[in-house]
């Protein structure tokens, strides 16, 4: 292997510093005219979604854009819905950061806006990510006075109840405690479409090449919401909690993310934790799958009363 001369090494370092300085000027979003220096192995790939040959083969960029809008709506009380992807930049790693530019429409006014959304993955193949930027592109930008880090580097600050590994799937005794859990009614699923979004996200992250056609087969069967706050009134107000655990029973996935049962008819279980840090605005989502046998709508007097659950 030929080693670089002193001058070559200096040119390489200078080129990298200039490259990342230009990236930082737009927070990683508008880099169409920024050339990638030769030898770069940890830069950003740019994808033009409006190019005639562009085809969205994997669903993650679109789902990430939708999650970013979800974060914006939660914090601002708005009702923007994803319309189309314009472009996105993706870090050159297995565990990626995405800088997405997309168009969304406000369902209440039909106003369209262009959004910039940043999603940082923390692990590969499992749902563990943070949305740190979700803003209309005409709003004030993050300035370069703040150091630009192009990969995962922070997450939403969480209460102890929402830290650590995901909880076990709740037992029947757990679910009988209505001070802690809320069973979502079927009529509430449409107005809380973020529940399905979280399920699609968990599946899409586990199976990176999942298509929109694959996701359309998923059917949400039952949902339970858990929050730290006890005796919330009315009970369905838990759906608006900034931090929560959501337990989803579903079918429509032929593969087995956990266990060995194959087929779209098989009922499967997903758990997703949501934490929103209102101070920083960060949204962190952590998710996984369970092969617990108990059902969400079972009821029995033989189960142990609700208490602290073992965490995995």
From Swiss-Prot:
<protein>
    <recommendedName>
        <fullName>UPF0725 protein At3g19520</fullName>
    </recommendedName>
</protein>
<comment type="similarity">
    <text>Belongs to the UPF0725 (EMB2204) family.</text>
</comment>
<dbReference type="InterPro" id="IPR006462">
    <property type="entry name" value="MS5"/>
</dbReference>
<dbReference type="Pfam" id="PF04776">
    <property type="entry name" value="protein_MS5"/>
</dbReference>
């Amino acid at each position: 292997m030929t080693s670089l001369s002193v001058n070559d090494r200096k040119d390489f370092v200078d080129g990298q510093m200039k490259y990342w300085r230009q990236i930082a000027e737009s927070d990683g979003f508008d880099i169409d005219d920024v050339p990638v220096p030769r030898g770069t192995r940890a830069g950003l790939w740019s994808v033009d979604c409006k190019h005639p040959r562009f085809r969205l083969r994997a669903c993650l960029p679109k789902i990430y854009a939708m999650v970013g809008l979800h974060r914006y709506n939660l914090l601002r009380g708005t009702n923007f819905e994803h319309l189309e992807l314009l472009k996105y930049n993706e870090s050159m790693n297995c565990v990626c950061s995405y800088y997405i530019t997309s168009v969304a429409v406000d369902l209440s006014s039909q106003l369209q806006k262009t959004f910039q959304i940043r999603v940082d993955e923390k692990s590969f193949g499992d749902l563990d990510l943070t949305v740190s930027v979700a803003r209309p592109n005409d709003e004030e930008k993050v300035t370069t006075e703040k150091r630009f880090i192009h990969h995962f580097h922070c997450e939403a600050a969480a209460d102890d109840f929402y830290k650590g590994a995901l909880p076990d799937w709740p037992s029947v005794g757990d679910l009988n405690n209505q001070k802690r859990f809320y069973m979502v009614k079927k009529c509430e699923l449409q107005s809380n479409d973020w529940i399905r979004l979280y399920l699609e996200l968990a599946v899409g992250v586990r199976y990176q090449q999942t298509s929109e056609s694959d996701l359309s087969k998923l059917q949400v069967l039952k949902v339970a919401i858990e929050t730290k706050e006890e005796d919330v009134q009315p009970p369905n107000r838990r759906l608006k909690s900034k931090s929560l655990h959501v337990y989803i029973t579903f079918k429509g996935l032929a593969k087995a993310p956990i266990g060995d049962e194959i087929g779209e008819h098989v009922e499967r279980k997903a758990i997703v934790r949501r934490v929103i840090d209102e101070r920083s605005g960060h949204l962190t989502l952590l998710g996984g799958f369970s092969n617990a046998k108990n059902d969400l709508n079972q009821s029995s007097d033989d189960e142990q009363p609700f208490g602290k659950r073992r965490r995995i």
